[in-house]
């Protein structure tokens, strides 16, 4: 009888362990939903108890970790580089701190060297399970950044995002919590909707109106518009009143581009070299050398560039955040290409050329009248 009881106890223990394991597996699967596929399998999963102590469900095998859906319906993921900061925040919250008091305590911890500041350009991922908020949102933290310096819009896209066609926009500029909101349209967990039809951009004959199409509405009226003659000389079609400069469509490439005005000298150099008959490879090499020598000043870290293309064989509406010399692991960013998904109208942002002076975050814009169709 004693032996039978021992066997039954052991079996019950195995069943309980199996049940806990299955529960943890379900929690892990749910927690990684905000991430792109290439980060999910090795992302860490954790939570906090009522005392603010960390509970680990799966150790991180890459540079991202996720917290399961909370009582407010949010599932979040972020860089493992910010773990110490989040752990401290959880303990302070458990002690009753919130709002300004909590932020002040974190700032004091930064000054004391107890936690690192939020890295410039670090990524945060959020999923929400109802349609009254943005359901899939990625955020790039840009502490103390100002929209005009980075060439960003501050016009809220919340309503457009709920309709499946929101554009990125900056919030809380000039503060320690400044960030770029990137609503993700077009995926299976995004808000439903999107533009009902595409805009016939080729029918737009006004060169200034066409040149500013890649921009959000609030930046278009104030952007400079330029072109180049056959000898590579700059022609100003409209002076600018913000940080953005747009170039009319390049008939050879089909691209219409807008960028931070600090890149003007670089585009001037490229135009001159192209007019001299240099190949693209030679132009890129010359520009690279000029950057290294300091002849060309790089654009601010985090600044945006905007590109429109009007055929279906490439990303039609693409925004690019410049992150010179940044590494994906430091910022919690993915590097898996989303080109094919973007052509289908459901691409996610991804980093390219990490660790180089031309490192950048590709931000395909889905769901708008200028975007690739599903």
Residue ranges, per PLM feature:
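Bacterial N-terminal signal peptides that target proteins for export
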Residues: 1-9
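Bacterial N-terminal signal peptides
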Residues: 9-17
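Primary mode marks residue(s) on the alpha4-beta5-alpha5 output face of response regulator receiver
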Residues: 24-374
């Amino acid at each position: 009888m004693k032996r039978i009881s021992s066997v039954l106890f052991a079996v019950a223990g195995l069943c309980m362990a199996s049940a806990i394991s299955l529960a943890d597996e379900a929690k892990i699967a749910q927690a990684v939903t905000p991430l792109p596929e290439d980060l999910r399998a090795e992302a860490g999963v954790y939570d906090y108890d009522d005392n603010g102590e960390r509970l680990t469900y799966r150790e991180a095998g890459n540079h991202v970790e996720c917290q399961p859906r909370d009582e407010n319906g949010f599932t979040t993921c972020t860089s493992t580089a910010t773990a110490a900061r989040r752990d401290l925040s959880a303990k302070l919250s458990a002690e009753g701190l919130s709002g300004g008091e909590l932020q002040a305590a974190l700032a004091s911890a930064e000054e004391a060297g107890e936690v690192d500041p939020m890295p410039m350009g670090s990524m945060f991922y959020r999923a929400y399970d109802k349609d009254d908020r943005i359901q899939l949102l990625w955020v790039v933290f840009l502490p103390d950044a100002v929209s005009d310096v980075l060439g960003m819009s501050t016009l809220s896209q919340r309503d457009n995002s709920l309709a499946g066609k929101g554009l990125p926009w900056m919030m809380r500029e000039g503060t320690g919590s400044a960030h770029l909101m990137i609503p993700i349209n077009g995926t299976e967990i995004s808000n439903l909707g999107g533009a009902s039809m595409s805009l016939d951009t080729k029918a737009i004959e006004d060169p200034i109106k066409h040149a500013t199409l890649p921009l959000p509405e609030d930046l278009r009226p104030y952007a400079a518009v330029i072109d180049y003659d056959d000898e590579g000389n700059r022609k100003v079609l409209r002076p600018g009143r913000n940080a953005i400069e747009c170039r009319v469509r390049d008939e050879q490439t089909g691209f219409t581009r807008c960028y931070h005005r600090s890149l003007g000298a670089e585009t001037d150099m490229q135009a001159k070299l192209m007019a001299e008959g240099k190949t693209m490879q030679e132009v890129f090499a010359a520009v690279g050398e000029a950057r290294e020598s300091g002849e060309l000043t790089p654009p601010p870290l985090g600044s945006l560039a905007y590109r429109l293309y009007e055929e279906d064989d490439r990303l039609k509406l693409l925004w690019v955040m410049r992150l010179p010399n940044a590494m994906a692991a430091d910022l919690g960013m993915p590097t898996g290409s989303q080109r094919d998904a973007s052509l289908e109208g459901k691409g996610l942002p991804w980093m390219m050329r990490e660790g180089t002076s031309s490192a950048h975050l590709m931000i395909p814009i889905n769901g708008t009248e200028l975007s690739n169709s599903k």
